[in-house]
């Protein structure tokens, strides 16, 4: 039986959807202990609890999971975006699309939500050989048991737009899926302003193509 609370769309403040919060002061966020991460990090409480359970299971199998990035607010994401905007040359539309291969416009990142984390390395190549391949294989086999999945897979008939594949990026589906639905209902392009090239948010339809451009929850997985 599906838990009815999972199907209900909770009320999230727009500030939470857009990343206009300080996770260190927000009631629903916990600070991640240093044993799990490489720098000061925050996650939603239920996400952190699920990650700790996954971390323990991975350790028991000889797999080490390390958070290298977790919650990022809109201001932080704006810094990432603007630096790339200034460093990339060429036509503005092309520039925006090239940045969007792997980086989100401010106000559109799943990292704003406290549900998503980057693990171990920020290169797909790391996860294609050696220890990285072992880590990725373990995550593919077991992450869903703890509520996590890879939202940015290779493009396929279901996911034919959005960011390129990110083998390091894992999302806590039970909460992220609810926030994503709330985002679709509450956010429009008038709220995605204030950064370099912001006109391309609507021109490139980033809400539908990028925020919503994620993989499906794995078949036969919990939740």
Question: Which residues fall in each region the model found?
Answer:
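Extracytoplasmic cell-surface/polysaccharide-interacting catalytic and binding patches
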Residues: 1-70, 74-223
């Amino acid at each position: 039986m599906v838990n009815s609370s999972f199907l209900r769309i909770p009320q999230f403040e727009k500030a939470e959807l857009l990343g206009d919060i300080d996770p260190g002061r927000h009631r629903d966020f916990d600070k991640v202990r240093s044993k799990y991460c490489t720098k000061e990090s925050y996650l939603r409480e239920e996400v952190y609890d699920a990650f700790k359970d996954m971390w323990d299971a991975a350790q028991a199998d000889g797999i080490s999971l390390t958070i290298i990035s977790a919650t990022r607010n809109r201001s932080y994401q704006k810094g990432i975006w603007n630096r790339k905007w200034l460093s990339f040359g060429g036509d503005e539309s092309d520039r925006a699309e090239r940045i969007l291969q792997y980086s989100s416009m401010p106000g559109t990142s799943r990292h704003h939500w406290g549900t998503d984390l980057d693990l171990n390395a920020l290169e797909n190549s790391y996860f294609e050989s050696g220890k990285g391949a072992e880590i990725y294989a373990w995550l593919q086999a077991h992450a869903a048991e703890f509520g996590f999945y890879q939202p940015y897979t290779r493009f396929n008939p279901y996911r034919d737009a959005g960011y390129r594949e990110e083998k390091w990026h894992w999302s806590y589906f039970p909460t992220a899926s609810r926030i994503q639905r709330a985002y679709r209902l509450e956010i429009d392009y008038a709220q995605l302003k204030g950064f370099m090239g912001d006109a391309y948010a609507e021109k490139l339809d980033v809400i539908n193509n990028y925020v919503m451009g994620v993989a499906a929850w794995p078949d036969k997985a919990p939740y």
